[in-house]
């Protein structure tokens, strides 16, 4: 063998072993260079691991100089503890009732693999409900109170759900039917809540009964509406402090969710299945098509092409778009559809769209990226950089530091405006005395103090936005205006002095 040749070897488990050792160091509190505070509870971690696992930490401009960070968006410390463990191990165990909390936290931290897995869990909930169980409960609901609402506690309300991402070499391989490994221990609190709720038939005589399953969490409640053996919506009841605020934009269309009133409670309905909601279908139903006489036929004609969307915008902290008038029209449209009203009655309905252009425009209202939404105020953005700059205001991040005095700012333009006070950059000039000032406010004070009564000075103040072309053009206009005024005054003077 040649002594200059290279010998290569590969240890497949080395990377996972390094992460495992880092996790042991984290649990022991050794060599940790940052402390993340969640609701006052500290969590020690390594910046490199956080930055490699979460784009939120990676794009944090001041992370390299910080020794501590507080995140107020995540309300449950246990949720962040599981997500932090996931960064080191690639595994996470969560209860089904906490999926919404994990989805909200993962969306804020931009952990895409957790977001996709939580969304997949919500979409696959309908596979845990047997159609035969629903039919049997409708007949013997009074005989078997523990199986009311057509749900088996032991098969649906599971305690930990195991999540293993594809890149985790130690994770278990998912089965063909589902990616969830569920224990069969039922929750007593959930079972008692199911017994108290009972099943409710909200439809008319010709409609399909709806069975509600209450999922109780720490901060949210969800109603899963079962229609025609498919869960098509997740309805999240918001607390008073977390209620979505009114907005000028509508939540209908391709956002995948809307707001409505259920039993006097305002809820946010989210499409999680492969079928759109029946309310949205009633609004976009074509006039030329044959109108179904019941909800079952309406669901039969729904399209399968509606993709599920990100759930971030519909849960706590997200600002839901709503218009109550449209919700009333949609409700009346659905009632007319269930009662088998003819096309003339639907045309007389104020909520029915008679024009194909209106129906086409309805599906394209207010498009935006659901994942670029501020968790604090619900404002949506088109670019990630705009969201990052906006989040600095809520997080108190001040990456722009003045090199003269050390004062910190959240935006670069604020720092540039502040630096004018330290340098000779004085773009605001007084037209009366020629003195220059670094700020517009300082110039205004100078005018009020030293040049009172000058009404036209403010309109002639030069600002940094005005170019030399603008100034030259304005001087030419002023000169021509003065010549015209002089000519008119001379003409008047000549006429008045003329002999009779």
Curated annotation (Swiss-Prot):
Cited InterPro entries: BTB/POZ_dom (IPR000210), SKP1/BTB/POZ_sf (IPR011333), Znf_C2H2_sf (IPR036236), Znf_C2H2_type (IPR013087), ZnFinger_BTB_dom_contain (IPR050457)
What coarse category fits the chief subcellular location reported for this protein?
Answer: nucleus
One molecular function GO term is: DNA-binding transcription factor activity, RNA polymerase II-specific
What lineage does the source organism belong to? Eukaryota, Metazoa, Chordata, Craniata, Vertebrata
Name of the gene this protein is made from:
ZBTB34
Protein name (Swiss-Prot/TrEMBL): Zinc finger and BTB domain-containing protein 34
The covalently linked position for Glycyl lysine isopeptide (Lys-Gly) (interchain with G-Cter in SUMO2), per the record, is: 235, 237, 426, 474
Pfam families attached here?
A: BTB (PF00651), zf-C2H2 (PF00096), zf-C2H2_4 (PF13894)
Report domain BTB positions: 32-96
**Zinc-finger as a keyword?**
yes
